[in-house]
């Protein structure tokens, strides 16, 4: 690299194949065609090794630009030792989760494990593989009527390392939709849901922290949806702080997981099977009742009660509370 030459300028002079490998094909095309400005490139918040900078590093490198870009959305605060309540809000008119690839799993893809364990370049390759123009167009039509839209990825630390797929997915959507990505909302408590069974997923709530811009519209994204608990927890945090979640999207998931709001029929069936004791216990433990379960969470719990009996499930829940 030439002395005093920026990484942006240096990368501009590299072969297209190298740019594709570093940025991914979609971003590299924007980069070459002039669609990715220096400001947008910096907004990726990556160093020359394509590793996310810490907030402290970003502030040290360009304090004025950092304060201008993040003063409203980033709170430099240590949440590690604080216990943050998990909130959920009424479902309202939230549409189904939009899933980019629902035909089969992405876990067998050659880049999946590296992306899941913290390699952003692998995550970007993975996103490029499954994100289509037609799907992005559907997202565009869904959000085009809203102003002040921000994309928030789930920051999830799994046991293999820090999962980069949600961030890569958010980066791609941010550029293709022309919507700002917001990294100021962070997961404050690890859940390790990837290796959890259904009951474990129900009990391991995810808390978030950060600054929500009241009155703004949010699109929340994750890599995969199973029961939808993480998205529900993130939505609850944002809406309890004055934001409005207009859409949730994941790169992968089964079609039957796409419906987040619990239906009246499923809620009625769950309450009939579980009785008042378990719902009251849940309300005391987590601060919300069965009406704020996702459809998949409720169906799973009802299925387990039917299979093993209410007494067995009550014992499992009460004994398994983290």
Where in this protein do the model-derived segments appear?
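Active-site-facing substrate-recognition patch
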Residues: 74-148, 192-212, 287, 301
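Short connector loops at secondary-structure junctions
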Residues: 181-196
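PRPP-dependent phosphoribosyltransferase catalytic core
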Residues: 74-104, 235-322
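A contiguous pocket-lining binding segment that forms or flanks enzyme active sites
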Residues: 217-241, 247-248
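Acidic, low-complexity, intrinsically disordered interaction modules
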Residues: 23, 28-61
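Short glycine-rich phosphate-binding loop at a beta-alpha junction
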Residues: 147-158
């Amino acid at each position: 690299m030439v002395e005093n030459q920026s990484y942006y300028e240096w990368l501009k002079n590299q072969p297209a194949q190298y740019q594709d490998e570093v940025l991914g094909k979609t971003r590299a095309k924007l980069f070459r065609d002039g669609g990715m400005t220096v400001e947008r490139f910096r907004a990726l918040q990556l160093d020359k090794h394509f590793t996310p900078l810490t907030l402290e590093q970003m502030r040290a490198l360009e304090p004025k630009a950092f304060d201008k870009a993040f003063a409203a959305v980033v709170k430099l605060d240590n949440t590690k030792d604080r216990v943050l309540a998990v909130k959920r809000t009424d479902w309202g008119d939230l549409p189904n989760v939009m899933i980019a690839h629902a035909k089969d799993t992405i876990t067998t893809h050659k880049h999946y494990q590296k992306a899941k364990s913290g390699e952003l370049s692998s995550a970007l390759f993975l996103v490029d593989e499954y994100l289509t123009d037609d799907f992005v167009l559907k997202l565009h039509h869904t959000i085009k009527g809203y102003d002040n839209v921000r994309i928030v990825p789930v920051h999830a630390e799994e046991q293999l390392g820090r999962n980069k797929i949600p961030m890569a997915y958010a980066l791609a959507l941010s550029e293709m939709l022309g919507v700002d990505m917001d990294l100021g909302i962070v997961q404050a408590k690890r859940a390790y849901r990837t290796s959890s069974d259904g009951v474990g997923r129900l009990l391991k709530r995810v808390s978030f922290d950060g600054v929500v811009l009241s009155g703004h519209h949010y699109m929340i994204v994750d890599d995969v949806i199973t029961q939808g608990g993480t998205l529900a927890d993130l939505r609850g945090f944002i809406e309890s702080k004055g934001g409005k979640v207009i859409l949730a999207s994941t790169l992968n998931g089964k079609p039957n997981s796409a419906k987040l709001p619990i239906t009246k029929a499923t809620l009625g069936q769950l309450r009939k099977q579980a009785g008042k004791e378990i719902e009251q216990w849940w309300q005391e433990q987590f601060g919300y009742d069965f009406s704020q379960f996702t459809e998949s969470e409720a169906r799973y719990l009802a299925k387990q009660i039917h299979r093993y009996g209410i007494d067995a499930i009550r014992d499992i829940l009460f004994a398994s509370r983290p």
